[in-house]
């Protein structure tokens, strides 16, 4: 394989909802380019893209697959991305290192929630988009309705390049209004027959051709002037206008294919090879300092590692994009994130499960290598003259959590090591050894996401594991003012222990003024605050600690010990043992002994006094509340609303967005435990949602009673 220059390289991501045909399209592209002699299929489990055992088990893409084709003296690096929202990380990763996206639309359903999600990702990153309507041979396909929906969602920027003469089982021909030709195929597919457009299609074809010419001309002043003069553009001028429109996202070309029979795939690849922008034509990159980086093969070496794969018999395979310069076998580079030195071994062009050894890859190219010493996903490696870092890729917040444990307790350490290793492959899930919940929590994008994680642990790592519902990180607080005092006294010969603390607790809210007095037994006492400490608690909320002791009743040197005693107590609330938060404590009196008083004595006295006061101050349980956004087809809104109301959700608003209903709500974390499964079941997998922590709020009284009873029962069980 020859070395390709930056102006000969194009990087393309294949995006689309699950079942839209991306892997089948990838197989057809490889076949059309002569990379494979025979096409595989998802059903036969022999495609180039889906080759990991877990993908073969479930029949879905789990990881993004990188491959390349050589097409008309150009190199196309293509990444086949998972379609399920559970594996959204694959799409986001791929978009960060490619230069444009082909978004497939399932001809049976038209634009789906996943279509719009993918489009939003391209919008955020400013990537060109080509829409591709697939499965035109489905009897459910209504192409005109799909186009109308797309124009409603994306506006006039959606410009048809092609349209089918007929859809359903009779699909075998389409009209290309860029080339103004008819493409047709035999029923089994194969090479297209290219003919002039038949007379009965000419009026429609000319109308769409004119719209395409106008859209292309709008991207270049010279083309616009020529269009006004002659009302036409040559094919080359059309291509130039479309290319510029792609870069500025002012044109979203719409193509048609039946990927299963390779109908239209060759023409799509011609467009990718001849029209879409090269790496060198895209806007410049920026490093973490905001500096522009030109993808120049003569510049300093800089390589970004965007993906790590764990492959049988090989180990770690590290995938990278050359951001600047050129990388060769044996190059010595420095890891900008970890400070370590790395020597690059054999580098490869990517080909799914296979790799093609190469001597050099230039700026803009994508490749992989194996057995890196200390390189993790997201790291930047630099040569001399480059001191750059590129941002770690940002992923959506996890939406589904499970507590995980090894069936054999002796495998616990092995389980943690396996989880940390596997997270290098997929950074969209998080593992947390929670001291608070006394569980190992894994958080992912959905039930299917974590189910595949469990399968890989059991089949790849040979670990038997169980999932269970994670505990909820409740909090405790108080609702009224209370006072308590406690004397700690211990005498057993020699130096004893003595400390007495008098304090007041009350609810704390941001912005409330410090008190100037307090009332006890009907008598008002003036307060002289000597010191104030506001502690932002590690688990959220605040503790405000005021020292108002007068007359030297307690030395200031004991105040840190008193604060520590209170903090210790706040780690175990009296109702359920949960962390306490948002409390103001005023220490206003106490006693000490000239010999027996010490830090331990005052810490213990403060702990008991605070606990007694907390119990008298109307303690309540708080639960975490999350902001929820659902994207739901209108037909399912009634069922989704009903389900949310049964989950104690508070509906905040509804809106229409991109052909779907957007529903905003606030919902307790407890009620989100099975929401991913429920929403998928209610909508046939056609809805999606996002969550974000919002606040802690009081639980209803009946739920508080149950939580307290459950906690007491757990304590009794532990005591047995």
Name each region found by the language model.
Residues 1-105, 109-111:
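P-loop NTPase switch module centered on the Walker A-proximal segment
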Residues 1-20, 107-312, 333, 367:
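P-loop NTPase catalytic nucleotide-binding module
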Residues 6-9, 23, 45-46, 59-63, ...:
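Amphipathic alpha-helical transducer elements in NTP-driven molecular machines
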Residues 46, 72-76, 96-102, 216-226, ...:
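Gly-rich Lys/Arg/Thr-decorated short loops/hinges at beta-loop-alpha junctions or inter-strand turns
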Residues 52-57, 76-87, 103-110, 135-138, ...:
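Flexible beta-alpha connector loops of hexameric P-loop NTPases
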Residues 73-75, 98-103, 126-132, 248-253, ...:
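Short, surface-exposed connector motifs at secondary-structure boundaries
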Residues 78-80, 255-256, 442-443:
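Short hydrophobic beta-strand that contains or immediately precedes a catalytic carboxylate
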Residues 149, 158-160, 164, 168, ...:
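Accessory interaction regions appended to the cores of large information-processing enzymes
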């Amino acid at each position: 394989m020859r070395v390709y220059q930056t102006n000969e390289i194009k990087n393309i991501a294949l995006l689309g909802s699950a079942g839209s045909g991306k892997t089948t399209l990838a197989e057809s592209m490889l076949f059309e380019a002569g990379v494979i002699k025979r096409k595989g299929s998802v059903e036969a489990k022999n495609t180039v893209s889906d080759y990991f055992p877990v993908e073969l088990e479930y029949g879905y893409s789990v990881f993004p697959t990188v491959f390349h084709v050589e097409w008309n003296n150009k190199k196309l690096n293509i990444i086949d991305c998972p379609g399920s929202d559970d594996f959204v990380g694959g799409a986001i990763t791929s978009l960060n290192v490619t230069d444009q996206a082909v978004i497939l639309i399932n001809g049976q359903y038209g634009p789906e929630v996943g279509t719009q999600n993918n489009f939003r990702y391209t919008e955020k990153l400013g990537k060109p988009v080509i829409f591709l309507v697939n499965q035109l041979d489905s009897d459910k396909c209504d192409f005109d309705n799909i186009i109308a929906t797309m124009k409603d969602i994306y506006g006039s920027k959606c410009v048809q390049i092609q349209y089918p003469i007929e859809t359903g089982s009779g699909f075998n021909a389409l009209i290309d209004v860029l080339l103004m030709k008819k493409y047709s195929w035999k029923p089994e597919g194969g090479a297209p027959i290219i003919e002039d457009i038949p007379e009965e299609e000419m009026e429609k074809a000319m109308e769409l051709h004119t719209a395409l010419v106008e859209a292309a001309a709008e991207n270049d002043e010279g083309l616009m002037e020529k269009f006004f003069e002659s009302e036409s553009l040559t094919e080359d001028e059309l291509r130039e206008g479309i290319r510029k429109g792609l870069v500025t996202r002012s044109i979203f070309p719409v193509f048609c294919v039946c990927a299963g029979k390779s109908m239209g795939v060759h023409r799509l690849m011609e467009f990718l090879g001849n029209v879409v922008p090269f790496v060198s034509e895209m806007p410049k990159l920026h490093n973490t300092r905001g500096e522009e980086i030109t993808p120049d093969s003569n510049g300093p070496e800089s390589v970004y590692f965007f993906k790590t794969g764990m492959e049988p018999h090989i180990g770690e395979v590290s995938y990278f994009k050359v951001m600047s310069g050129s990388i060769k076998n044996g190059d010595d580079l420095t890891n900008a994130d970890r400070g370590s030195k790395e020597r690059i071994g054999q580098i490869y062009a990517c080909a799914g499960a296979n790799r093609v050894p190469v001597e050099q890859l230039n700026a803009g190219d994508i490749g992989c290598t194996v057995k890196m010493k200390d390189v993790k996903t997201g790291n930047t490696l630099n040569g001399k003259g480059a001191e750059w870092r590129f941002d770690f890729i940002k992923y959506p917040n996890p939406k589904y959590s499970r507590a995980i444990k090894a069936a054999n307790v002796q495998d616990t350490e092995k389980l943690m090591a396996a989880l940390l290793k596997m997270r290098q492959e997929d950074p969209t899930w998080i593992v947390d050894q929670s001291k608070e919940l006394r569980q190992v929590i894994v958080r992912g994008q959905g039930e299917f996401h974590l189910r595949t994680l469990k399968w890989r642990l059991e089949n790849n790592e040979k670990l038997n594991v169980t999932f269970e519902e994670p505990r909820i990180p409740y909090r405790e607080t108080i609702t009224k003012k209370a006072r308590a005092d406690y004397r700690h006294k211990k005498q057993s010969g020699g130096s004893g222990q003595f400390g007495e603390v008098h304090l007041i607790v009350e609810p704390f809210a941001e912005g409330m003024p410090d008190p100037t007095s307090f009332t006890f037994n009907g008598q008002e006492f003036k307060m002289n605050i000597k010191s104030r400490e506001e502690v932002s608690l590690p688990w959220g909320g605040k503790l405000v600690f005021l020292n108002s002791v007068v007359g030297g009743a307690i030395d200031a040197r004991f105040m840190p010990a008193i604060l520590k005693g209170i903090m210790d107590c706040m780690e175990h609330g009296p109702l359920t043992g949960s962390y306490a938060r948002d409390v103001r404590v005023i220490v206003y009196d106490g006693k000490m002994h000239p010999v027996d008083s010490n830090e331990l004595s005052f810490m213990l006295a403060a702990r008991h006094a605070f606990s007694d006061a907390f119990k008298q101050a109307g303690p309540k349980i708080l639960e975490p509340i999350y902001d929820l956004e659902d994207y739901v087809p209108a037909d399912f809104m009634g069922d989704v609303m009903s389900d949310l109301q049964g989950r104690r959700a508070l509906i905040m608003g509804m809106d229409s967005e991109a052909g779907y209903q957007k529903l905003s709500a606030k919902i307790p974390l407890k009620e989100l435990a099975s929401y991913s499964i429920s929403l998928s079941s209610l909508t046939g997998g056609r809805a999606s949602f996002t969550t974000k922590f919002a606040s802690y709020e009081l639980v209803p009284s009946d739920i508080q009673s149950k939580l307290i009873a459950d906690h007491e029962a757990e304590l009794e069980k532990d005591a047995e």
